[in-house]
Amino acid sequence: MRLILPVGLIATTLAIAPVRFDREKVFRVKPQDEKQADIIKDLAKTNELDFWYPGATHHVAANMMVDFRVSEKESQAIQSALDQNKMHYEILIHDLQEEIEKQFDVKEDIPGRHSYAKYNNWEKIVAWTEKMMDKYPEMVSRIKIGSTVEDNPLYVLKIGEKNERRKAIFTDCGIHAREWVSPAFCQWFVYQATKTYGRNKIMTKLLDRMNFYILPVFNVDGYIWSWTKNRMWRKNRSKNQNSKCIGTDLNRNFNASWNSIPNTNDPCADNYRGSAPESEKETKAVTNFIRSHLNEIKVYITFHSYSQMLLFPYGYTSKLPPNHEDLAKVAKIGTDVLSTRYETRYIYGPIESTIYPISGSSLDWAYDLGIKHTFAFELRDKGKFGFLLPESRIKPTCRETMLAVKFIAKYILKHTS
């Protein structure tokens, strides 16, 4: 018997169907001069290119490695245009949907147990925060700092002395929804900090003398959307006035030279800055929390992916901050320490000259607020998998990054008052 569905139900079902990326490709192109850079920009005007690196069309420049996603329908035309203009390129990913499915390459060892070797959805992360509080009641507390536009809670885990105000490090993960290895690291950090306290000399010393504030998922609505509807989603899920396009790039929404970089005012662009500084509920919740704990917080660290970099201010100007030498020293040693585990090589430097100019970033905002040690990690890899780092790479990524974070914490403990 044929089942006839009401038209409205069919429409709703189609509307919420997850986006598929069958036979979509990711190209890597290195324009040799400004003319070739302009060719890429022109292609972006007539084709729907999703820029993975750099984060937007206007950042494309000569001698920069440029990664972008192309639909199956447009990939042949793009390839032909690159060939005609004698541009060097490689195809990093031949079938994006296939890579998305291959990303889950670790089997769940014990069903129901929180896995640090797998990517976890928001529901599992919330349950995990409760579990960590129950398991370590003297060391872990959960603070609701606000809620999202879709009314999901924003939780910060405080690791350390529950009732004492001491030096602290604030860390956030998952400000961009599709960068899944970032929230995986925040979970790993909490797990290792609590598990090794009393056993690992360095971690014990750190937790005896300082607190850590961990925001495991900054962009909760976007993260949920990337799990359920569109794996490539980047922004949050707020509605934009006078536009059908959804979302703001939360890392362009901070009050740090907010409107100084052009081409961030299009609500349909992935790097849309929002209608005003701190216009987004997530941004406001984080800035309010950090302001209220400013006397404690000595370090701000934010985790992104991908490209293997350790960045520090500024993004909105080529001017170097007053303590540039100190920041560069910490970043250099941090990347050296990170490489001792698996010989993974990171580069380091100011955002503006190391990656590309950006305005409205959380890193610059925290620095200008008075937190003089602010860093952004761009985690693995360098582009082979991009945002689709396989689960089998989560633990190695977290282990090596943990070494760098512990070094930064030790340095701050010793060198700040």
From Swiss-Prot:
Q: Where does Zn(2+) bind?
A: H176, E179, H304
The record's annotation in SMART domains points to: Zn_pept
Q: What is the lineage of its organism?
A: Eukaryota, Metazoa, Chordata, Craniata, Vertebrata
**Which gene underlies this protein?**
CPA3
- What species is this protein from? Homo sapiens (Human)
The catalytic activity, as recorded, is: Release of a C-terminal amino acid, but little or no action with -Asp, -Glu, -Arg, -Lys or -Pro
Any idea what this protein is called? Mast cell carboxypeptidase A
The GO annotation for biological process reads: angiotensin maturation; proteolysis
Which residues does the propeptide include?
16-109
Residues in Peptidase M14 domain copies? 118-412
Q: Which Pfam families match?
A: Peptidase_M14 (PF00246), Propep_M14 (PF02244)
